[in-house]
Structures are given as C-alpha cells and as structure tokens.
Amino acid sequence: MSHADRQRAVRSSAPPLLTARELHKRFGDNEVLKGVDLTLYRGEVVVLIGPSGSGKTTVLRSLNGLETPDAGVLTLDGGPEIDFVTPPSKRTRFALRDRSAMVFQHHNLFPHLTVINNVIEGPLRVQRRPKDEVMAEARGLLARVGLSDKENAYPHELSGGQQQRVGIVRALALRPDLLLFDEPTSALDPELVGEVLIVIKELADEGWTMVVVTHELAFAREAADHVLFLDGGVVVEEGPPQQLFTAPAHERTRRFLTRIMRPLDGV
Amino acid sequence: MDLWELFLSSIGPIALAGLTGTIPLALISFVFGLVLALGAALMRISEHRILSAVARVYISIIRGTPLLVQLFVIFYGLPSIGVVVDPWPSAIFAFSLNVGGYGAEVIRAAILSVPKGQWEAAYTAGMGRTRTLTRIILPQAARVSVPPLSNTFISLVKDTSLASLILVSELFRTAQQIAAFSYKFMVVYLTAALVYWVICLVLSLGQDALEKRLDRHVAR
C-alpha cells in the first residue's frame, strides 16, 4: 500500500486511537502549551515539528503521563476521558504508560544491564510474559535492527546509533499500541542519523502507530501521514506533509522551514 | 622490659581485641547503619512530607551532635529513665544510628545522581516507583556510593575506639589496660595505631576491588 493510500485509509476509518484536546501546561511563568489538539488514528504516523521551546516534546510527554497537563482532555482508544483539571490518579497514568512506549533523545538505556536485559526487563518483569517467548521475540527484534551480535554487550560498548536502535527495540518489545519518539536522532553524530531513521521509517511502513518529535524534515516528509507545526505552545498549522512542506499556509511555518532547510540564507 | 619485647608482647592482645572487638563492632554497626541509611534516604526523597521531615530531623541530630555525646546519652543517660543497656548493644545502637545519619545523605545524593531519564525510561516500560528504585536506580546509585560509604566505614572503624569509654573491651581499651600496667604509653599506643592502620588498609583494598567490580558496566 502506498503512503498516500494508507493515509487516506486511516484518516477515514473508525474512531481515533487517541485524541488530545486543549492541552495546557505551564512550568512556572512559562506557558509551554496554550491549548494543543492532536488526533491520532491507528496505524498513523504523526510528526511534530517546530522550533525548540515550541512545546512539541511536552505534548509528546503528556501522551504517556511523563508530564501532567494543567488542563485538557485526553481519550485513549475509546476509554474514559482523562480530564486534567483534576490530577490523574496513579492508575490512570499507569494505564497511559501501559499502552505506549517511548524512545528518548538520549536513549536512556539502563547502563548496568546488557542489551538483551534492557530489552526484556519490561516484558518479563512488568508484563510477566513467559521467558521463552520474550527472549525469542527480543532476539528477533535485535536481529532485525542488525544487533544480534550485541545482545550481551553493555550499552556503553555500543555506538550512538546502535544504542538508539536498542532503545527502539526496547520500546517495541513492550508491544505498545503507540510508539512515541522524542527527537530520536538529535543527540546522534550526523553519520549515525540514517541508520536510526531507516529503522523508524520501516516501522512506519509496517503500520505501527507513532508520534514522532523530530527536526529531520526529510524524514517527516517521507514517513509522516500528518504533520503538526508547533510554535509558542500552539499548533500553527497541520496537514499532510506534501501540503505543509510544499505549500505552507502560514508565514511562521514558512520561516521555520526555510531556516531549517537553508540555514545560511539569513546570514 | 625492652621496648621491642613490649611491642611483641602487646601486639598479640591488641590485635586480638581488634578481631574480637573492633571489627565485629564496626561490621555489625555498619550493616545496621546501612539499612537505616537506605530507609532514611528513601524517606528523605519521598514526596510524603512527614516522612521526609522525620528523616531530615534524624539526619540533622546525628550530624549535629558529637558521637561521643550520643554514646554517653545511650549508655549513661538512658539508665536514669529506667532503660539499662549493656555496653555492646549500646555501642552498636549508637554507631548504627550514626552511620544511618551520615549514610543517608550519601545514599540520597547517589540516588539523585542517577539521571532523570533513567526513571522515565523505567516508567515508560510500565515499572512503578518501587520496582524502578530496586531494579534500575539503586544498582546505579550503589556504584556512586561506594567511595563515600567506604569513607564512612573507615571512619566508623576508628570511631569504635570511643566505645572504650563505655567499657566495651575493644582494641583501644585493651591497649589502655596494657599501657596502665607497663607505663610504656608510646609503644603501646603506637602499636594500637598500627593495628587500626592495618585494618583500614585492608578496607581500602576491599574498596578498590569493589569499585573495579562495579565498574565493569560503566564507561569511564
């Protein structure tokens, strides 16, 4: 199925996997989210772009309970509405986390555990799935990202790109409904970015539902079904990547895209 | 008596008192103290205000009063309110409390030194706070706390000499008794110092070995 087909298929099909409405968040005097809406359909890849401080990471972290918005409503898979006006219970936050998995900017692998133990920790000890099954699945996932020979290595023995691929495998092993990527390549040396983006692109093509915060516009254009441009805590513009990248409707979007794609123009 | 002979005749009983008094006293107190320290550190960083405040007061009292005074309060003070504790339990009690207070700050700092991303990665894998602490945070904090806790332990070994003042027959009290008989204070106390030094040297070697072991998984 081509990308455009898939996109049409998802946006028109059944209820969304996740909706966030009017998310507000303030850190001290700094209002980072000023009413953000986001809708995510099953099998869809939504990419958040925007300048640093625009609130895109905060939006992402609100989706799995790492941040608690001050106001707004979140609905996950037709479940009960989570209204952030009252702080969500522990149980609610756990429910959010159980459905999703996250890949971090700085991989956040557990340094005292081997690669394989990083991957199986969640499935084995939290989800309490049978060890044989978990091991087989973990090895399969490591093989597919080309890291079979690293299963007994410790994270510090790997390159940045390898670490991040383990980070992705660790997330996949949890079998989440929703994958969250928080600037997965921003901390990598430029020559290592590709190997990580290729893996993420493959997952997108396979139909994983994901929200990706990134500065890699070429990746967004290739892999996204839907792109949100955030600036100053609001969604300035959103739409399919072709539209947003080739014919941005807003001056702010245009300026941002120009700055990223032709950084020397303003000099 | 020749000084060398006195040294030879006193090092035996002094070393023996080290083995039967100082070392067990330090070891037992350190183990109890570590348990207290871990508990106090967790209370101190907990979001529960009362727990945190209790830990804070405990740490403050331990660090803010002399160990000798703590020891005397327990051994000589408690009997006046009807609680009589023998020398050994008194000493273990006081030293454990002391290690607990100092160790709590060490462990708290070590826990806080583990990057926030580690908590977040564990949470997003579905782990709760307790599991995150035991599986992810404490193993990493352990490595960080080895050098400062070794310091605490070495200090403790030397501080056990204070127990001689509440009649525990440990290394220093034995030395005092020998000195009182022989009147050769210099030789006897230097012998005692030598034995303390040897014990602490061994502990330092142990610290090095432990650090190397825990360093296996960490890039330096």
PLM segments and residue spans:
Chain A
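ABC-family P-loop ATPase nucleotide-binding domain
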Residues: 1-24, 264-267
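C-terminal boundary and immediately downstream tail of ABC-type ATPase nucleotide-binding domains
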Residues: 2-3, 242-267
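ABC family nucleotide-binding domain
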Residues: 15-241
